[in-house]
């Protein structure tokens, strides 16, 4: 892997890495890596990682070389002859651009390329390092266990500061080879980090088959295949939007196109823009024309005033005014069944066809018709050429989910019952509101279910609608058919609540806010009800005021997608901790004894967490399929679970999810690396660096015996599994035997002596000795090399099990005397030196590959003799004197110089030295050197 990266860095130009995989490895070990990116995305592949266009990074050459901080790589966008955009990697050495330090004794800080002065900005640097530390911990919470996850804000608004909303009006393309269409579509987009979700509704056109995003040159940036359905709503997501396209999106330079696959081959297109009305919009309309192939259309975004019955609206129109026309008078009408209710006159132009106005003081009849979707808004031009578009106003439609988590802690009289309520709503264009409700852990029978406003007085309920909820098996469903326009507006602004009153709690035992959950690209929400999460479902039950629900699904690749919404999780007394780490979500089997299949999903704060879990064991997939799995959220107050729910996800996964194939350079397939012990320090977030191996999860730093071969010992080191074969000590006897239940042979004489002396050793410990290093039992009298993680087996020591006491006695190995003048250590892990073999004259390249003797090593373009040592050279960096490589019978091994652990917080690295040192020690040495220099000058 590392030499493959060296080869890539040498070539400097990469679009994708091709080659062959390593030859069949001796052990089934693979470190977890990032998933391969879709082939449809433009970018660069570098060392198994995908980078978007115009991304910059420091290349990581792996152990023991690490990150090249003085080398900057850039994914440059290129265009082929056919106009297709692809990525090309270029790397340059930045060390030549370093400014000259202003001090006499500059230092090189870890992770930096340029030297800096140790004094001056120390205070600011310390603050920045603290900020980086907390930012890193914050970022860790945003990472899912295997792949990815993000957390929503705790704010009650559905959109946080990291999201941006856009809108597009799509009309028939008049300059296309396809016939112009009379269809109109409205698309709403939300950009969150690097993902763009979209909700599209359309009229007067058959369901499209393809959605395409077009860049400034008219080239396709992304395509979305529309799934078949019998409705007029399209939901989709564009993941990993490249940075150039994100800039074009922010600059309102991207277009969106939709085409049908039927015989008519219609196409609609429009520009994606930002608009100030999107934030407050609660009603909308699509305006179409009765003409055939008109290419005209419009959309209306409307909202009610918070206190008065004023209807604010903005019209966006296309094709109504001929190009190049000056001011054109239009009439904007509000109608009910062809009866004119209101009319506004205005002038618009082809360049600025947007129109904004307020319809003041709507009466009760107009508000009633508005709530039923029966009000029609129309725009008509005046003059010789009359053009007309119109559409009905209804509650704003999108792919977002109206939902609510009901908890006892959110009730007007807060409690801790451990109960839960989970509600999902659907608002129809005619104003009716469907609901589905699940409950668990109620203390008594349900008296009423109601939709309410926020209490105007303390503990004084403000009931709007009583829902006729009849519960069957703790489920209820129904419809509220007369939702007023004002309440529809409040519903879409997250201002309404749902309340469940019981016999013992007549004012309400469970309560929750009805919130719009933004669409995230998963269809589980649109097709399934969430799983309730409650304290009463934890084993043993927990009396808590918290509750939650979750959507869980398994895709065709056997990856588990989850989304969790919680309400009222308990917080610890330490506000600083509870503000950052709110909960831990995990998934497992209903049988608490089956801890091997419990998986941590993510740590999160706020009210929402979502992500993807890969590499699921067959056993856990089977439990998901049979409905015997659970999802649990734990907190600091309840570390063994505060809320839990039983999940049932039917799937047809008969084997673990396949790993992504990664291609390696075939030229470097014999390279082996020895890990640097100083980089294997204990990590406080062990779940982030844990390993998945043979269907089981292992925490960072743990060791175990693998199932495929009990004569190996495996350890987990920062998401990488390292398995070492058991090292057997050298026996001094001539005849050995191999016991079936042991990995190492023993002396046959020792076995016979044991049998004859069995009567004398009646008090011998029958179980043997337990050694903490390899966590194994060793038979009485056996010897072995100790296993010390993360270093592996130590050849310089031999341990013996004292059978009479059960104690382990370890002593250093005595090395034999050598006759040669220049002995060598064949392997850094070997305890004793050996005499090197006699040197042979160098061979030609052809002979090197065909020699029958000891294999030589090829590193880059150079060949090295067995036992030969050298410092590797890296392109753009030069010789790396802190790393030593050696040839071990045809296998190249490299190791960085081992550095002592430092106790200071701010270590520095000086030029010419491989190990960092404390700045205090450095300054002290500098002062002593200066004093010595002064004394020298005094003597002269």
Swiss-Prot record:
SMART domains the record matches: CHRD, VWC
Glycoprotein among keywords: yes
Residues spanning the signal sequence: 1-19
CHRD domain sequence ranges: 162-277, 279-398, 404-519, 525-652
Glycosylation sites: 347, 430
Pfam assignment, any one: VWC
Name of the encoding gene: chd
PTM per Swiss-Prot/TrEMBL: Cleaved by tolloid proteases; cleavage participates in dorsoventral patterning during early development.
InterPro entries linked to this entry: Chordin (IPR016353), Chordin-like_regulators (IPR052278), CHRD (IPR010895), VWF_dom (IPR001007)
Keywords attached to this entry: Developmental protein, Glycoprotein, Repeat, Secreted, Signal
Biological process (GO), any one: anterior/posterior axis specification
Any one GO cellular component localisation term in the record: extracellular space
Protein name, per record: Chordin
VWFC domain residues: 42-118, 689-748, 767-836, 855-919
Gene3D superfamilies: 6.20.200.20
UniProt main location, coarse: secreted
Family, similarity comment: Belongs to the chordin family.
General function of this protein: Dorsalizing factor. Key developmental protein that dorsalizes early vertebrate embryonic tissues by binding to ventralizing TGF-beta family bone morphogenetic proteins (BMPs) and sequestering them in latent complexes.
Compartments where found: Secreted
Subunit structure as annotated in this protein's UniProt entry: Interacts with twsg1 and/or bmp4.
GO molecular function annotation: BMP binding
């Amino acid at each position: 892997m590392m030499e493959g990266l060296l080869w890539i860095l040498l070539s400097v130009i990469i679009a994708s890495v091709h080659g062959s995989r390593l030859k069949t490895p001796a052990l089934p070990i693979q470190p977890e890596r990032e998933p391969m990116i879709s082939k449809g995305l433009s970018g660069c592949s570098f060392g198994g990682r995908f980078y978007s266009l115009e991304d910059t990074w420091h290349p990581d050459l792996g152990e023991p070389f690490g990150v090249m901080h003085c080398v900057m790589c850039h994914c440059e966008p290129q265009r082929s002859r056919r106009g297709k955009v692809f990525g090309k990697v270029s790397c340059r050495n930045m060390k030549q651009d370093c400014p000259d330090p202003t001090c006499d004794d500059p230092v090189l800080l870890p992770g930096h390329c340029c030297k800096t002065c140790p004094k001056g900005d120390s205070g600011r640097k310390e603050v920045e390092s603290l900020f980086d530390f907390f930012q890193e911990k914050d970022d860790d919470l945003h990472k899912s266990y295997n792949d990815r996850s993000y957390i929503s804000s705790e704010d009650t608004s559905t959109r946080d500061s990291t999201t941006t909303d856009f809108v597009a009006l799509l009309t028939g393309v008049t300059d296309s080879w396809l016939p112009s269409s009379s269809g109109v579509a409205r698309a709403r987009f939300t950009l969150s980090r690097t993902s763009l979700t979209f909700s599209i509704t359309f009229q007067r056109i058959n369901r499209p088959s393809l959605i395409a995003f077009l860049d400034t040159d008219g080239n396709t940036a992304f395509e979305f295949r529309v799934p078949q359905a019998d409705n007029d709503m399209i939901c989709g997501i564009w993941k990993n939007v490249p940075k150039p396209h994100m800039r074009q999106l922010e600059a309102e330079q991207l277009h969106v196109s939709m085409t049908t696959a039927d015989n008519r081959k219609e196409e609609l297109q429009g520009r994606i823009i930002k608009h100030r009305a999107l934030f407050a919009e609660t009603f909308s309309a699509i305006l179409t024309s009765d003409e055939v192939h008109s290419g005209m259309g419009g959309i209306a975004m409307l909202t009610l005033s918070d206190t008065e019955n004023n209807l604010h609206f903005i019209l966006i129109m296309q094709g109504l005014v001929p190009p190049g026309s000056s001011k054109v008078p239009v009439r904007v009408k509000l109608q009910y069944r062809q009866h004119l209710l209101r009319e506004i006159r205005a002038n618009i132009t082809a360049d600025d066809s947007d129109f904004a106005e307020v319809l003041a003081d709507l009466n009760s009849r107009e508000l009633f018709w508005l709530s039923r979707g029966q009000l029609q808004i129309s725009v008509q031009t005046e003059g010789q050429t009359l053009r007309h578009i119109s559409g009905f106003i209804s509650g704003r439609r999108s792919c977002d989910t109206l939902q609510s988590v009901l908890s006892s802690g959110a009730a007007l009289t807060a409690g801790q019952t451990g109960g839960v309520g989970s509600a999902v709503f659907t608002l129809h264009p005619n104003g009716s509101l469907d609901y589905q409700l699940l409950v668990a852990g109620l203390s008594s029978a349900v008296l009423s279910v109601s939709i309410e406003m926020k209490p105007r007085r303390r503990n004084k309920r403000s009931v709007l609608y009583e829902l006729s909820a009849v519960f069957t098996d703790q489920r209820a469903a129904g419809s509220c058919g007369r939702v007023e326009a004002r309440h529809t507006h409040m519903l879409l602004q997250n201002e309404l609540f749902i309340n469940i009153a019981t016999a013992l709690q007549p004012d309400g035992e469970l309560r929750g806010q009805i919130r719009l959950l933004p669409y995230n690209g998963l269809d589980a929400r649109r097709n399934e009800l969430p799983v309730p999460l409650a304290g009463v479902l934890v084993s043993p039950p927990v009396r808590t005021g918290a509750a939650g629900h979750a959507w869980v699904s398994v895709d065709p690749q056997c990856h588990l997608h989850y989304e969790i919404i919680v309400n009222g999780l308990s917080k610890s007394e330490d506000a600083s901790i509870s503000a950052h780490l709110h909960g831990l979500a995990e998934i497992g089997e209903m049988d608490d004894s089956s801890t091997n299949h419990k998986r941590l999903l993510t740590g999160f704060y706020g009210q929402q967490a979502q992500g993807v879990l890969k590499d699921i064991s067959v056993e856990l997939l089977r439990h998901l399929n049979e409905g015997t799995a659970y999802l649990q959220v734990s907190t600091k107050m309840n570390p063994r679970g505060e809320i839990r729910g039983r999940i049932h996800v039917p799937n047809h996964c008969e084997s673990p999810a396949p790993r992504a194939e990664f291609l390696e350079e075939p030229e470097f397939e014999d390279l082996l690396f020895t890990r640097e012990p100083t980089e294997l320090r204990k990590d406080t977030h062990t779940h982030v660096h844990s390993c998945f191996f043979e269907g089981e999860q292992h925490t960072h730093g743990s060791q175990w015996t693998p199932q495929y071969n009990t004569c190996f010992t495996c350890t987990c080191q920062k998401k990488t599994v390292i398995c070492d074969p058991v090292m057997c000590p050298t026996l001094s006897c001539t005849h050995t035997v191999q016991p079936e239940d042991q990995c190492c042979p023993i002396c046959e004489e020792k076995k016979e002596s044991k049998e004859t002396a069995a009567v004398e050793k009646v008090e011998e410990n029958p179980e043997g000795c337990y050694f903490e290093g390899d966590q194994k039992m060793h038979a009485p009298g056996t010897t072995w090399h100790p296993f010390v993680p993360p270093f592996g087996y130590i050849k310089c020591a031999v341990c013996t099990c004292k059978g009479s006491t059960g104690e382990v006695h370890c002593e250093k190995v005595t090395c034999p005397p050598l006759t040669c003048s220049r002995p060598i250590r064949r392997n850094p892990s070997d305890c004793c030196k050996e005499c090197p073999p006699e040197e042979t004259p160098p061979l030609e390249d052809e002979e090197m590959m065909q020699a029958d003797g000891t294999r030589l090593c090829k590193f880059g373009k150079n060949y090295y003799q067995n036992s030969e040592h050298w410092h590797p050279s890296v392109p753009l960096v030069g010789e790396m004197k802190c790393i030593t490589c050696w040839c071990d019978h045809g296998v190249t091994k490299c190791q960085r110089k081992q550095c002592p652990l430092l106790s200071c917080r701010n270590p520095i690295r000086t030029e010419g030295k491989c190990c960092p040192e404390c700045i205090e020690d450095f300054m002290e040495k500098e002062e002593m050197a200066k004093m010595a220099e002064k004394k020298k000058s005094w003597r002269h």
